[in-house]
Amino acid sequence: MNRLKQLYENSIKPAIVKEFDIKNSMLIPKLDKIVISVGVGESSKDEKILQNMADTISLIAGQKAVITNAKKSIAGFKVREGFPVGIKVTLRKDNMFVFLDKLVSIALPRVKDFRGLSRDGFDGRGNYNFGLDEQLMFPEVEYDKILKTHGMNITIVTTANSDKEAFKLLELFGVPFAKGK
């Protein structure tokens, strides 16, 4: 069993039940999924860079990434229907816990001048969004094999009913939030 999954079962669940006085065990907040997405921008024109980006995200996530295509044409953005516009991967169950463990204990501490994640990333429904400026902080990524550095958006979806519950859940998982507020 994964380290964070054990932590959730043994100490996080009881702490959340105690703090929020939850009577029904089905209402205890838990992680649902983690979505990693990248907008490809100008890189969509170069198939080699696009494939390299998809391979990098697959390495980071430990699961095959999917290239997403535009659903309709938008002249203002010079995008036509069917053009690649992004790359995403959705992690659930064990892969989700493995990625979160790697993110919290390895990747985020490697970020230069890291002061913690912003507390403003909650959406009001118990989900948390944040962005990373580059992919080089992950141990699987080799600098020599990267054709173009890119950032990524990470969405952590929880079953929490409020941002307060979601914040406490993520804090107990060890997600480093910035001090203040």
Curated annotation (Swiss-Prot):
Keyword flag Membrane: no
Ribosomal protein listed as a keyword: yes
GO biological process: translation
Source domain of life: Bacteria
One Gene Ontology cellular component: ribosome
Function in brief: This is one of the proteins that bind and probably mediate the attachment of the 5S RNA into the large ribosomal subunit, where it forms part of the central protuberance. In the 70S ribosome it contacts protein S13 of the 30S subunit (bridge B1b), connecting the 2 subunits; this bridge is implicated in subunit movement. Contacts the P site tRNA; the 5S rRNA and some of its associated proteins might help stabilize positioning of ribosome-bound tRNAs.
PANTHER family in UniProt: 60S RIBOSOMAL PROTEIN L11-RELATED
Protein family membership: Belongs to the universal ribosomal protein uL5 family.
Assembly, per entry: Part of the 50S ribosomal subunit; part of the 5S rRNA/L5/L18/L25 subcomplex. Contacts the 5S rRNA and the P site tRNA. Forms a bridge to the 30S subunit in the 70S ribosome.
Name the record gives this protein: Large ribosomal subunit protein uL5
